[in-house]
Amino acid sequence: TGVQTCALPLYPDDPLPPLVKAGLAHVQFETIHPFLDGNGRIGRMFITLLVEHWGLLDQPLLYPSVAFKRRRQEYYARLAAVRTDGDWERWTAFFLDCVKDAADDGARVAQAIHALMGRDRARVVHHERATITAVKLLDLLPSNPVLTVLRASELLGITAPPARKAIDLLEELGVLRETTGKQRDRVYAYHAYLELLTES
């Protein structure tokens, strides 16, 4: 089948470096176009999953999609050149450039997140009404950047009132932002963190 054909460059005894194999698999997937919709998204996700699967990363943290988007015309031209002219070399060089750009973007975002967390932690810790609960909640925000009072209480293993108090402090400091405008069933977002993730 088409999907099995994508797996041809993935055999473990293939001497090609894993990133090169991921690039070749991406071209094959995009060429086969096995689904009616979503092939582009799945093909780009395929790269990230392969890189993690082969142990190059502990988590799926490499997203070349942004680099492809920045160089969209060249991306499509390189894919087309493989199909029409068999120009695998230029595709591979382009792909590896995009992977490097994605890694650079990821490192920059990680540094920015680290700095943001440090600044926000200092603001919380030095606030006159600081609580251990508020600090713990702040530490949980990167893996839970959007939450409710109920979710915060579950994450912290506490009742709703102290969770509400921690959220109120983080909201007062501008760390959390209420997103619904409602008085009930409010949802809070770690807005600055989400902006860092989406701007890249």
Label each residue range with its predicted role.
Residues L141, A163-L173, Y188:
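Basic amphipathic alpha-helical segments that dock to polyanions
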Residues C98-R129, T133:
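Conserved alpha/beta core segments of nucleic-acid transaction machinery
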Residues A7-Q111:
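Phosphate/pyrophosphate-binding active-site loops
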Residues V146, E172-E178:
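Short hinge/loop at the helix->beta-strand junction immediately C-terminal to the helix-turn-helix recognition helix
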Residues G157-I158, L176:
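The short coil/loop that forms the "turn" connecting the two helices of the helix-turn-helix
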Residues L138, S143-L156:
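Short acidic, hydrophobic short linear motifs in intrinsically disordered regions
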Residues A130-T131, E178-S200:
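Short, cationic-aromatic polyanion-contact patches
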Residues T1-C6:
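Positively charged, low-complexity/disordered segments
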